[in-house]
Regions:
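Bacterial Sec-dependent signal peptides at the C-terminal "C-region" and cleavage site
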Residues: 3, 9-30
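Catalytic glycan-binding domains that act on GlcNAc-containing polysaccharides
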Residues: 22-144
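Structural motif marking the loop-to-transmembrane transition
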Residues: 2-3, 114
Length: 144
């Protein structure tokens, strides 16, 4: 019964030309940007901090890491040198700022190079020399 009523209503609207905009109309949809690194970002945050934006890691090392994706001071120094945007380690407790830094470095690679991005995020620019970054990549793959 309901189906017949809906069908009749649709036919009436079509005949009254209320069912669609005139042909010279334009419909604009909000632009949703596509970020090929979003899943990689989420996986790295899970491995690095279990998603905790207030995490402090690597306390056993000379240089600690901070925030949801565990950013080190040396990374922030390089980010400032490249972009002119100066963040402190405490800024990395803000997930939006940490994500901004992470995504900047992702753009140095093509979207298909998740392994290289992940390993360099973990091991720095000489990640290829560090076997530990292979183990890190294996953890990331499980989260993707």
């Amino acid at each position: 019964m309901m189906g017949k009523i809906m069908g009749t209503l649709i036919l009436i609207l079509m005949f009254m030309n209320l069912g669609a905009p005139p042909s010279n109309s334009v419909v604009i949809f909000e632009n949703e940007s596509v970020n090929p690194f979003e899943n990689l970002y989420k996986a790295i945050c899970e491995v690095e901090s279990s998603g905790n934006p207030l995490a402090i890691g690597d306390r056993h090392l000379k240089e600690w890491s901070y925030g949801i994706c565990q950013v080190r001071r040396s990374r922030l120094t390089d980010y400032y040198r490249r972009t002119g945007i100066r963040y402190s380690t405490s800024d990395m407790f803000d997930p939006a700022k940490a994500k901004e830094v992470f995504m900047y470095y992702c753009m140095d690679y093509s979207p298909s190079q998740f392994m290289e991005i992940s390993r360099s995020w973990n091991g720095g620019y000489d990640y290829m020399k560090k076997n530990s970054t292979i183990q890190y990549w294996n953890k990331i793959q499980k989260q993707l």
